[in-house]
């Protein structure tokens, strides 16, 4: 702005001046700008009106949307290039009806509803969620998380007024479904292990870690076969159970450890693997219901409610840990709702649920 041009600002309590002050202070130009301000106004619209009608004020710092509403000429400044501000609808903690409050907030931002009205008044709309009164969310989730994540899903459904259609399965099965085409794409995917998110990462936003659990060996009470390490599984006469390595993260990690320790060939020659189940839950049922299995490789998180006729043997191997993460599908019609669902899964209440179900917490610090 030339030195001869009078300048006006909104009052210091108003957002435009604070935004202007913060940005111009970074470039060392705020003080000289403030000194040239002849007058301040309590509201941005009053400032815009003064620029439009007054001979004493020829320029001012206002929102570009306000300038367009008053038919004023905007002069883009390099210093203000990143001076955008987001209008948000915020649900109060005191509300007695959060579901309808959230619906109204979604309505305001929906491209089919409120968004065109904001654009009509010269605001730049965000890409809001598709408007549906009761959205149906498709959530693919690794089976190991089923019980731990249930609390978060129930709470979210009740608050948001949506329906979450869950598909729990081995991550090999889930990834195969995702890779088969867009008609099998979920809105949100939570893995059994981060390695499976990596297989489909281009289809998803940046994932967030949630939890982790270790692979362990489940043996008979008293450990009659004296199984102490994975290397002991190479001995003849030991009946081994794993989950399917093609369908399950747990099975893939188990067989990867066999290969890394160079015992896979011995296990195959001894025909030791006599049970291969789709899920750890089914494998544990086999272990508890029949005596043909001497050892089963499962997650620690699967072992919270076991009968007393089995024991857990720890596995000390770098591959004996699975980390669960979560991400939103890029093509989801409800990206903002998915952000809130992720926040629910990463909340303090969810932290407690995962810990109670035998997981280690890998999400944000909850102060617990």
For each predicted feature, which ranges?
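Exported/periplasmic ABC-transporter solute-binding proteins
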Residues: 1-167, 172-186, 191-213, 219-368
């Amino acid at each position: 702005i030339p030195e001869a041009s009078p300048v006006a600002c909104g009052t210091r309590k108003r957002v435009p001046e604070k935004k202007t002050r913060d940005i111009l202070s970074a470039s060392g130009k705020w003080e000289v700008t403030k000194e040239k301000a002849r007058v301040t106004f309590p509201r941005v619209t009053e400032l815009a009106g003064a620029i439009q009608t007054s001979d004493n004020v020829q320029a001012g710092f206002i929102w570009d949307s306000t300038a367009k509403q008053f038919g004023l000429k905007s002069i883009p400044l390099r210093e203000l290039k990143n001076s955008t501000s987001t209008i948000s609808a915020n649900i109060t903690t005191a509300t007695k009806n959060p579901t309808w409050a959230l619906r109204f907030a979604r309505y305001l931002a929906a491209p089919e509803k409120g968004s065109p009205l904001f654009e009509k008044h010269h605001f730049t709309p965000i890409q809001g969620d598709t408007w549906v009164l009761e959205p149906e969310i498709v959530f693919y989730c690794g089976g190991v998380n089923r019980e731990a994540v249930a609390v978060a899903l129930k709470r979210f459904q009740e608050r948001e007024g949506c329906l979450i259609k869950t598909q729990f399965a081995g991550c090999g099965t889930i990834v195969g479904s995702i890779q088969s085409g867009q008609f099998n794409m979920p809105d949100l995917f939570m893995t059994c292990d981060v390695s499976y998110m990596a297989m489909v990462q281009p289809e998803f936003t940046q994932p967030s870690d949630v939890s982790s659990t270790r692979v362990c060996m489940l043996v008979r009470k008293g450990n009659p076969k004296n199984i102490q390490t994975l290397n002991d599984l190479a001995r003849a006469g030991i009946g081994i159970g794993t989950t399917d390595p093609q369908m399950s993260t747990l099975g893939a990690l188990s067989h990867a450890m066999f290969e890394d320790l160079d015992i896979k060939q011995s296990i195959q020659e001894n025909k030791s693997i006599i049970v291969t189940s789709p899920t750890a839950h089914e494998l544990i049922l086999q272990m508890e219901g029949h005596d043909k299995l001497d050892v089963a490789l499962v997650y620690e998180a699967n072992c919270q409610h076991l009968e007393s006729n089995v024991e857990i043997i720890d596995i000390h191997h770098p591959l004996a840990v699975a980390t669960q993460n979560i991400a939103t599908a890029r093509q989801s019609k409800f990206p903002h709702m998915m952000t809130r669902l992720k926040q629910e899964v990463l909340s303090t209440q969810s932290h407690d649920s995962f810990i109670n179900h035998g997981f280690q917490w890998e999400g944000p610090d909850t102060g617990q």
